[in-house]
């Protein structure tokens, strides 16, 4: 395919095709597994600051030469060590917020405060044992290093006749996981991510003066950096958007009311009735897609995938073109196929992750739901 589209974009496109084709969106929360899987007996964790204590943390800036005739007015890149104390606190708070471990203890004072030079130093097994014993925990997650790269730019936005001042900071935290019984770290993580700020002004100087100050930027970047490794360490809830067909027949409209009341079983009965009660392929496709969403909400991901595949096959017949056989096919040619295929791809990804997620959540004895509607979940598009 020459182009790819998001589920939301395809939905907006479909809405423009006709008012009779009613779509509503719902927000859902679903659990995604972490990259790491911890043994179920590890219930208590300490988050520690294992970085050098560097008192001088000035930004080291390099300014680029700007070519004439471009919208870019200025651009400079700066490098700095991030604030490890703030990042360690943020890391501990974010892990505690996920409610995965029974207890999260923080030790944000630098373990290597006496270091003369910035360096990474892996904790020895004896140090890990002593820390775990003194803090009363089963294992250690340590922030080992934090580097920041900040890019500041001012450019003219011709379409808005104004200037934009932007700061884009890329954070590079290094995190190690230590178990007392191991002589070496269980793993080392080197994630990275970006945080962005922007301001606007009538002149380049005005836009530049409104930009976030360095001190605030460094603090907020350190807080953000602490959250970056968390998805690699513990399962996390992710927000998603799903779309339901709500028009075309009385059962479909009534089912939409049940969804707003969170009565999914009643909605399913009407969607199934709509699917079985018609030979119209478009109506069957819409009902099938809704039933797929129903099964996803019930955590029956295999059934959800089965119904999404039915919807996809019907969409292929409706659009009268096999998208996989033509590199020239676009959303204009196969809008229904795009919508069903994008949703099916999301379900396949969730299904592939499910065994790992179940393994990671097996430490909890109670019955868990991996999918749930977000508060105020139904919103008409």
Where are these regions (language model features)?
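Bacterial N-terminal signal peptides that target proteins for export
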Residues: 1-7
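C-terminal/domain-edge helix-coil "capping" segments
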Residues: 20-42, 178-287, 291, 297-369
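N-terminal intrinsically disordered, low-complexity regulatory tails that precede a folded domain
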Residues: 21-30, 34-46, 52, 58-67, ...
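A short, hydrophobic beta-strand-centered structural micro-motif
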Residues: 42-51, 122-159, 173-175
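N-terminal segment of the mature soluble domain
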Residues: 51-142, 182-187, 320-323, 328-364
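Amphipathic beta-strand/beta-sheet edge segments enriched in Tyr/Trp
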Residues: 142-205
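Conserved small/polar residues in nucleotide/adenosyl-binding loops
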Residues: 370-375
